[in-house]
């Protein structure tokens, strides 16, 4: 194992960066708080005055609940405004503009490339391979591209959006080994709850160049709350916390998220995940029988990527039936594809009905 530390990969000018010390980060105690220029009165729209004060930057109860959920230490976890903020923090914290590259695997979630562009970090693309088992990551090619470009960050979306494929844990570990001391491998597990592949978080004890992204937006149904987690080496988490905006987690969102992680709420979430997985299999089996459907990719997420003979006609037929899906036709290599989120059984039946009626009318 390499003796290099992940902190050697951080931008030189940020290693001693203190960041902004907000009033809420001080350890002072008292019953009259006049240190943050907040209002002494609540707003009429907030009868219990629960939002008149700035929030805890990293709410302790929520952070502990998330760490327990994901099986990591609290000091290894940073809460942010969705995974988007964590992606941005990683790129800004590690990549020197116009020097340190970011590796991505298109077609894939677009925010990796957006954050790289905003940081002026060179972008290296290693496209997913379209094979008999679906669109999947070519991990050896990804590793080689990262080494050739001297990349600082490698983003592996698993399960991948929009492809739906998951990367075996052994392949992720191989990438971590090959890139230790050279690059941070970021495994985006936004759809991890729907996958058969175990989380990469368990590898963190052996590889300090691993970072994992998780979210409450998908399986936990809290998309508007914007609660994302970055799980990584504790020193790296502390550094990125100093790079983060002062108050990233609004109090109402933190309260709701902590309630969503109670045992009864988690039991409901698990039942819904089980139902989504069953509906995913049912919808997949039904779609492959629909005339005009060219290919339905296997998926480990809560969606299906579908190729059509006429994707425009399929998109319009669904829209006319009141069903909005994600049009992928502008994405390179997906000019005939739509991404369909798994809904309720009734919603999925509406998808099938609209596509079947389109073919009957043709």
From Swiss-Prot:
The modification N6-(pyridoxal phosphate)lysine is found at residue 218. GO terms for molecular function: histidinol-phosphate transaminase activity; pyridoxal phosphate binding. Keywords: Amino-acid biosynthesis, Aminotransferase, Histidine biosynthesis, Pyridoxal phosphate, Transferase. SUPFAM superfamilies: PLP-dependent transferases (SSF53383). InterPro entries: Aminotransferase_I/II_large, HisP_aminotrans, PyrdxlP-dep_Trfase, PyrdxlP-dep_Trfase_major, PyrdxlP-dep_Trfase_small. Pfam families: Aminotran_1_2. It catalyses: L-histidinol phosphate + 2-oxoglutarate = 3-(imidazol-4-yl)-2-oxopropyl phosphate + L-glutamate. Homodimer. Belongs to the class-II pyridoxal-phosphate-dependent aminotransferase family. Histidinol-phosphate aminotransferase subfamily. This is Histidinol-phosphate aminotransferase. It comes from Xanthomonas campestris pv. campestris (strain ATCC 33913 / DSM 3586 / NCPPB 528 / LMG 568 / P 25).
